[in-house]
Amino acid sequence: MHRHDCFKTPADEDELDDIDDDMVVGVIAEIEQEVLNESESDDDEYDLADMGAPEPERNDGNISSNESISSDGSFDPNAEDTDSDDSMLDEAATAGASIAKRRKEQNAMDGAEPSGSGPSGSGDYSHLDEDDETDETVRAMIAAIKKPRSAPPEIRLEDFITDICFHPERDIIALATIIGDVHLYEYGNEENKLLRSIEVHAKACRDVEFTEDGRSLITCSKDKCVMVTDMETEKLKKLYETAHDDAINKLHVLDERLFATGDDAGTVKLWDFRTKDAIFELKEVEDQITQMLTNEQNKLLLATSADGYLTTFNIGARKLYVQSEPYEEELNCMGIYRGSSKLVVGTSKGRLYTYNWGYFGYHCDMYPGVKSPISLMIPITDRIACVAGEDGNIRACHIAPYRNLGVVGQHNMPIESLDINSSGELLASSSHNNDVRFWNVKYFEDFGDIKYNEKHNAYKDKRHNLPSSKCTNASDFFADMTKEQDDDDNDDGGNNTTAAGSNNVT
């Protein structure tokens, strides 16, 4: 609340014989008390802070109250006696009452609640209008606040999320947890709805996948079991008890009949839903299987491992096809690009190795990538990949030639899993913070192909925030303001030209 603690008085006291300082202070206190009573709000400090000091209406023939109180130079001791002090008090009372009335009407329109105090706990910015603001920065902030959502809100669980998987046909995402449960959420831009929670395994559920028709869930666990569960009835359809001798780390669905599993000791097994036992198994590495992959023909099954090998199995012949030279780093993830002609593998040193399809003995190209380990990779288009890892950032890169396109999204902690929906427009990621975030990546459809000799700034590319990122580039934030300023300048220039032209016309 603003108070006037000291009044400036002229040197000649005869001009204000009828004015008592104590009386003026008393009247001001009465006015402020009336404003407090009229506000009818429990949060008086909030209202008065927003109301500020009363500003009387300016008249051409009178001196404003602010000038008469706080400005020494505006007082003329030789001026004629007037009722300026009395009029000052009257105008202050009128202005204070008017502001309090407008404040009361605004509270009534907003439900008599300050922003953010509603039942939902989130601020209501519907009454904000950027057209009413004169400050360009404030207008830009209001526009950003009122921007409609393009992706679902985040999902947060109490338990650690080990893996996520999108449903192939419906807007449903499955979340596997460290306690062995699977949570099914129906997602949407406005809200996410928990459909059901299924208790599947006794130990950590390490991987979850949907069958191609979306009717069943396949899960593998640290308890060495593989389970096939009906998504609607939550009933167990098939149990592969003790499917491996070691904890199972990864599984991959090949088609409606076949799926593969890999464990912590490097064993890979191929399964048929119609049989009880595995079709075949091979052990060619000594460390954890980190990912498995096939192309559309399903003739070759590729597996990366933590001991630095890329191993390829011939599914039809049920034997080893080829194994790469050993790398002094973990091979964590991979993806197929360029019309199934290129295989790209991400490593624990942040590198990206490229292989020509069918020639998996040694890479044909290497891109340094980022300095942090790459543990996850998702193909977005035939030429664009999203990679993530321990630094908490999801980055997009162009494949052949390699280019960093920018940051798609970010987490506060290392990212654990990554998946994209069937339409290719929505990317989901989970982190060690037990949260799942969604990123709309539809804008990648408009990205053109990059030429080998095209100039670029690698430093800026790594730090550039793409439209889906929660962080905004400073240049993007002020871009609209600069554009509006340029438009205003052009309009002024046009008006000046028109005026000059009219002056030249005789």
UniProtKB/Swiss-Prot annotation:
InterPro entries: WD40/YVTN_repeat-like_dom_sf (IPR015943), WD40_repeat_CS (IPR019775), WD40_repeat_dom_sf (IPR036322), WD40_rpt (IPR001680), WDR55_POC1 (IPR050505). Residues 33-48, 78-87 have a biased composition (Acidic residues). It comes from the Eukaryota. Belongs to the WD repeat WDR55 family. Keywords: Repeat, WD repeat. Residues 1-11 have a biased composition (Basic and acidic residues). This is WD repeat-containing protein 55 homolog. WD repeats lie at residues 156-195, 200-239, 243-281, 284-323, 326-365, 410-449. PANTHER family: WD REPEAT-CONTAINING PROTEIN 55 (PTHR44019:SF20). SUPFAM superfamilies: WD40 repeat-like. SMART domains: WD40. The keyword Repeat applies. Residues 1-20, 33-87, 100-132, 480-506 are annotated as: Disordered. Residues 61-74, 493-506 have a biased composition (Low complexity).
